[in-house]
Amino acid sequence: LGADGFYTRGGEQLAFTISVMSGEQDRIDIAQAAAQQIRAIGINCTVEIPAQMDWSGQMACLIGWGSPFDADDHTYKVFGTDKGANYSSYSNAAVDEALTKARQSDDPAVRKAYYADFQQALAADPAYAFICYIDANYVATSRLHGIDAETVMGHHGVGIFWNVETWTLD
């Protein structure tokens, strides 16, 4: 540990930067909290908030996503080799096979089995360091009816507004 409180090796300080997209205050706050904790253990971690994310040039990034309506919605794009939202260039043949087979079936039991295979493969070879699940708190007047609290899964889940067209107000 150096005099500045950070580890070095061969004269080079152990350091990295977490990039976070601008306009995502919740993720900016999470990145800043993580950086503070990482600095406390001797790694010089900083946060940058670029106007435009350079997906090929960052050291680390804090992102989030969800598949609120169907597991295939974002999962295939995020974890499939060479897919559009696979920003980390993750590649795993078992993950690709499970995701491809799951999206080719309309049988819920078959899809569930393939998504279980996907989760096992991803757990054995993680694409990311998953650090949290962002949840949400909502408050509404008791005069509003139709909100189903069981579907509230944060801003990436189904969300509170999934059935807004059926809500009524006394």
Label for each model-derived stretch:
Residues M21, P50, W65:
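Cofactor-binding loop segments of dinucleotide-utilizing enzymes, especially the Rossmann-like FAD-
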Residues L1-A35, D117, L169:
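Append "and occasionally in soluble cytosolic enzymes with long acidic Gly/Pro-rich linkers
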